[in-house]
Amino acid sequence: MIETDKLAAERIIAATPTSSHEEVFERALRPRQLDDYVGQEKVRGQLEIFIEAAKRRSEPLDHVLLFGPPGLGKTTLAHIIAREMGVNLRQTSGPVLERAGDLAALLTNLEANDVLFIDEIHRLSPVVEEILYPALEDYQIDIMIGEGPAARSVKLDLQPFTLVGATTRAGMLTNPLRDRFGIVARLEFYDADQLARIVRRSASLLNAHIDPSGALEIAKRSRGTPRIANRLLRRVRDFAEVKADGQITAAVADAALAMLDVDPVGFDLMDRKLLEAILHKFDGGPVGIDNLAAAIGEERDTIEDVLEPYLIQQGFLQRTPRGRVATLLTYRHFGLSAPDAGNAERGMWDTPAGK
């Protein structure tokens, strides 16, 4: 998994933050109010109502679970929730909370109606999760004092608070934890027009000059993800300042992204390497994952966790019982003639695919 994480961090079209410097950059561009938050209309509309109702009753907002692919704005929404409620936000992540005492220290320092944001909440340890249950339901925690026969349990009362949990893997949450969230919201990929609005807003904050056509060109290659759109904007801005007097047009954006090896649908070299291997080395598939990994010189986990999800989600790749198969979209993307349906069907089921 270390190598997988390393490759993900090195890709300019990675949906996860590539560095601590990028996280600082993201914070500077983060919208501060729901009115400034672009996209996710359904989730935004729900939160507007729930937040206003909680404020009118002078109560904490119900606990909120935000899930969906990385880079879509879960952390941003957590900050907006706290700001709209007019309370403090304390932020941590599941892997950081190793002991029950770590969580207890956070909870006991919360003020009334504060927001506690736990990123990667699916990675909480079972011990920490057990402490969290009574805190969420009754605003109380039980802690053990002393050791051995002298040990005793002490119940501590907490201030009412709101937990905002974020995860990219909602299926890994335990049922007892999931059931304690009153508000559950899934964040979806953005369309090109929404991303273009985000790019124009970010460009304004960066004092970058961008045409609507330039913003749309960046948006189309951002894989439906605001984090990627903002990262590409930074690189295109650099290119424009050196090669185009600082003005980002569609042509400038296209030239900059071509230099970065990001093609018109947002594929990078690794995406194309995988798809071209299936097309040219395995006649479009099916091909087993181990054979494919050997053919492109990557680890199996890297293919499954880093490369494949977006290709499958966009319809360029299929997983079948016999292995990976390139779709008609893939043939069209590379300007190739697709095999006729009869040959494709025989290839899918009759050609040995390897392990």
From Swiss-Prot:
It comes from the Bacteria. Residues 191-261 are annotated as: Small ATPAse domain (RuvB-S). Its main location: cytoplasm. GO terms for biological process: DNA recombination; DNA repair. Mg(2+) binds at residue 75. It catalyses: ATP + H2O = ADP + phosphate + H(+). DNA binds at residues 300, 319, 324. It is found in: Cytoplasm. Pfam families: AAA_lid_4 (PF17864), RuvB_C (PF05491), RuvB_N (PF05496). SMART domains: AAA. Residues 4-190 are annotated as: Large ATPase domain (RuvB-L). Its EC number is 3.6.4.-. Keywords: ATP-binding, Cytoplasm, DNA damage, DNA recombination, DNA repair, DNA-binding, Hydrolase, Nucleotide-binding. Has 3 domains, the large (RuvB-L) and small ATPase (RuvB-S) domains and the C-terminal head (RuvB-H) domain. The head domain binds DNA, while the ATPase domains jointly bind ATP, ADP or are empty depending on the state of the subunit in the translocation cycle. During a single DNA translocation step the structure of each domain remains the same, but their relative positions change. Homohexamer. Forms an RuvA(8)-RuvB(12)-Holliday junction (HJ) complex. HJ DNA is sandwiched between 2 RuvA tetramers; dsDNA enters through RuvA and exits via RuvB. An RuvB hexamer assembles on each DNA strand where it exits the tetramer. Each RuvB hexamer is contacted by two RuvA subunits (via domain III) on 2 adjacent RuvB subunits; this complex drives branch migration. In the full resolvosome a probable DNA-RuvA(4)-RuvB(12)-RuvC(2) complex forms which resolves the HJ. Belongs to the RuvB family. This is Holliday junction branch migration complex subunit RuvB. It comes from Burkholderia ambifaria (strain ATCC BAA-244 / DSM 16087 / CCUG 44356 / LMG 19182 / AMMD). The gene is ruvB.
